[in-house]
């Protein structure tokens, strides 16, 4: 065992071989490096697989031995200051190592085919491998200095990956937005680290926690300073994990390739903030105000993320807001003292969300030959539908991921989310009510996404649902064809620009590109042509893209059972509790308390009922766009009653506008901060150009004219220049003599 731990420090550097080899190859032998293009994917997967095997061995030893290992190298700068660099292996580290490596391998295998035709193939795999290196270094860090170094590297990699297609202005703006937003959190983190060192005199975690706890218990430090510096540390996690109010970068980060989105949302950037909170939880637990702040930010984030996802039409942005909401659950858990539930949901959500993002990539990959390669069309759920017959495997995997995120048993997220809900009732009934309500919203928007994507018919082949076959526009009413005139068709499925006012009852249409329309056939084609891989219809992805989906399905089905307490309090079968024993004991938690299965079953029935209600509402509104609502007497009678519609319409429009416009938070930031800062920058630029540059330019111009004047007086002869020079020197000496004599006379008297 000791020998395995002794080599744990090498883990972050194994994937680093890929970007270094690609860089040297392109520098020294570019032709040979590009000729073995696809081999770099195999190289990346192989090296990360070695790390995964190493991590699995460490995790097994953690479960069996409950052992915390720390290896340090001391770098002494002088007698008063020494910096220790090292590697820390504990339950949290081993969990993160398994997540990063397993999800990373699946994403790399998937990316080999997904990015095969991209000109930036080598740059993509170099950036992905360097991102894995940065995250592995972050989770194995033994002190705050190492944390900050790898923290910045993770941010840099995310910046490069989000802006991978930097020639697109939207992608360039998205990576800048992510970079600037995270600068706020990173600056807070740096100040917090320096503040903690000022208080404790140590960067190393174990020493820092002990010194800090002693100072708190002995009232050896001002509580206001402690709270302030701890808040700055938490600010870094808020920005990195897209928590309110620094969440605005997350949906725009979807401008990168879909495998990047899967990696960022499941195992790297957004998880880094959660990891930081978990790592510093022994410090936060002795500061009640910080724990209250963490739980408050978590509950606000989970609710806002769910409401913002309700009306999004971009499949990746819907999943992005889903990630924001689920990260709110994970952030809520440590805030209410539920370290185990936070770790549990971190695991289950990672695999479910990776499955959903890679599934969405398969969908987008199949839609691009039909609607074009613009994300506004290939990622638009309004143009999808009916993909079940074309993407049967993707459909099954996406459905399982959706059910897991909805909290339907026995899938993974059910067990972890229910544990958070149970603990939230003990902490605050208000927080518990919000969390349970958000469970219903999650089920609604996730099934809305699934139904719009896979059910009914392929809507891109409809020129207009109302029957105007010659029109180049199309709109769909969720109330059915016959009710479209009653409710001014276009409802939820209308599409608009971001700067337009959105209404649930607006009559809007979506224009299909004329080049794409020339490729289309009538929708009434025979099934013989449907099964062919033609540009007119989507087709299932290749095996290299489907294999990661199937593997992630296995994780989604079974990974939840590692945290189920089958044992009635005996820790032989509760794998997660055994895994977390050292950390939870350090946080003074007792895992031997009896597990109340009756209470768990009661709460589970309640939460599953809420989720099923959300699924039912989504099925009611989106499940039968074309036919079912025509024959649904309840819905037809509902829409025919004008008084009810008058009452319902303003409420729905307010909710829809709030969701579609992201709560107007982005608009507020753009108005107050972006325009304000740009205005200030223009003002300072104008001052610099006109005043500062004016002064320096004025001296230059004055010198020029003086020189020209002297040249004119001298006439271009050297003798004249010498005469003028001697004259000026003589005048200067005479003036100096008289001034010196006057000064001496004044001093004498």
From Swiss-Prot:
It holds the Pfam family Proton_antipo_M. InterPro entries: NADH_UbQ_OxRdtase_chlpt_su5_C, NADHpl_OxRdtase_5_subgr, ND/Mrp_TM, NU5C-like, Proton_antipo_N. Its main location: plastid. It is found in: Plastid, Chloroplast thylakoid membrane. One of its GO terms (cellular component) is chloroplast thylakoid membrane. It is an enzyme of class 7 (translocase). PANTHER family: NADH-UBIQUINONE OXIDOREDUCTASE CHAIN 5. NDH shuttles electrons from NAD(P)H:plastoquinone, via FMN and iron-sulfur (Fe-S) centers, to quinones in the photosynthetic chain and possibly in a chloroplast respiratory chain. The immediate electron acceptor for the enzyme in this species is believed to be plastoquinone. Couples the redox reaction to proton translocation, and thus conserves the redox energy in a proton gradient. Belongs to the complex I subunit 5 family. This is NAD(P)H-quinone oxidoreductase subunit 5, chloroplastic. It comes from Illicium oligandrum. The gene is ndhF.
